[in-house]
Regions:
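Extended substrate-binding grooves/exosites of carbohydrate-active enzymes
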Residues: 1-166
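Short beta-turn/strand-loop junction motif enriched in small, turn-promoting residues
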Residues: 15, 191, 209-212
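Ordered hydrophobic segments in well-structured contexts
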Residues: 81-83, 97, 158, 172, ...
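Short, solvent-exposed loop/linker segments at the N-terminal edge
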Residues: 86-92, 190-201
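Beta-strand-rich structural segments
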Residues: 98-100, 199-214
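Active/binding-pocket-proximal capping segment
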Residues: 113-117, 176-179, 215
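Edge beta-strands of extracellular beta-sandwich domains
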Residues: 165-177
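Low-complexity, acidic Ser/Thr/Pro/Gly-rich terminal tails and inter-domain linkers that flank the onset
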Residues: 176-196
Length: 215
C-alpha cells in the first residue's frame, strides 16, 4: 500500500508523480486517512494510512517521512524521523524498506553485523523523501542460527538517520518471539480525559513477547 501511494511501478497517480508535475499544477490529493465502512459497498475500504482503530500503517510513516527534517514548534509533530518497515518474520521480504526524511540513513543488521548506508540524492526530482530499499539483506536463517546459539538478543535492525553527519533519529526492530504477555497502552495523543461524563479514550491491547516486541 505504501509503495502504491508513493511511487508504484505501474502508471497511477502517486505522491512522487504529483511532485513531478509542472508549476502550473496547483495541487493534488490521494485517498482517505482511515480504513472505514464504505456505506455504498459491502466491502470495507482498506486504503487508509491508519486502520479503522486509528493505528498507523506503513503508509502513515511513508507520508510522515515527507515532512521537513527541521523542528517546528507550530506543528504537532515535526523534525527528523526514521522508520523500518519490516517485521523480521520467516515470511518477510529479503528487501528491507526504510522511511526517513534525513539526508543519510545507516542500517545495521545484527550486533557486530554489516552496516549499509543510503544518501539522499538532492538533485532527484519528485517526492522529498523517496522510499529507501536495502535489497536482499534480511536472512531468516541467520536469525534462526543465532537464536539457537542463544544470541537472539543480538538479532535486530537498527536504522540511524543522520543530518550533517550527526545521528538525529533512530529506530530499532527486533523479531517477536513467543507470545508471553498482553500489554495495554492508552492512545490519547497526550490529551487527558475530561471528567464530564462524555469523554472517552482508546486503550490498545497488544500481544508481545517477554521483551515487549509486538507479535
Amino acid at each position: 500500500q505504501a509503495a502504491h501511494y508513493a511511487s508504484p511501478y505501474y502508471n497511477y497517480i502517486c505522491y512522487d508523480g504529483l511532485y513531478k508535475e509542472s508549476p502550473c499544477h496547483v495541487g493534488g490529493c490521494l485517498w482517505h486517512s482511515f480504513d472505514h465502512q464504505r456505506g455504498y459497498h459491502p466491502d470495507p475500504f482498506y486504503g487508509g494510512l491508519m486502520d479503522v482503530f486509528r493505528q498507523p500503517k506503513y503508509s502513515y510513516y511513508m507520508f510522515k517521512a515527507q515532512r521537513p527534517a527541521v523542528v517546528s514548534e507550530s506543528l504537532a509533530e515535526s523534525g527528523p524521523m526514521v522508520y523500518i518497515a519490516h517485521e523480521m518474520t520467516p515470511f518477510s521480504s529479503r528487501d528491507v524498506t526504510v522511511y526517513s526524511n534525513c539526508d543519510e540513513v545507516r542500517l545495521t543488521v545484527n550486533k557486530d553485523g554489516q552496516t549499509y548506508t543510503y544518501k539522499k540524492d538532492k538533485t532527484r526530482k519528485g517526492m522529498p523523501s523517496p522510499v529507501i530499499t536495502f535489497p536482499g539483506i534480511f536472512d531468516f536463517m541467520v536469525d534462526k542460527k543465532m537464536t539457537r546459539e542463544k544470541h537472539d538478543a543480538d538479532v535486530y535492525f537498527l536504522a540511524e538517520g543522520l543530518m550533517d553527519g550527526k545521528v538525529v533519529a533512530t529506530h530499532k526492530v527486533m523479531p517477536a518471539r513467543r507470545a508471553e504477555q498482553i500489554r495495554l497502552r492508552v492512545d490519547n495523543e497526550g490529551i487527558g480525559l475530561r471528567a464530564d461524563g462524555s469523554d472517552f479514550v482508546t486503550v490498545v491491547a497488544e500481544i508481545t513477547d517477554k521483551n515487549g516486541n509486538v507479535k
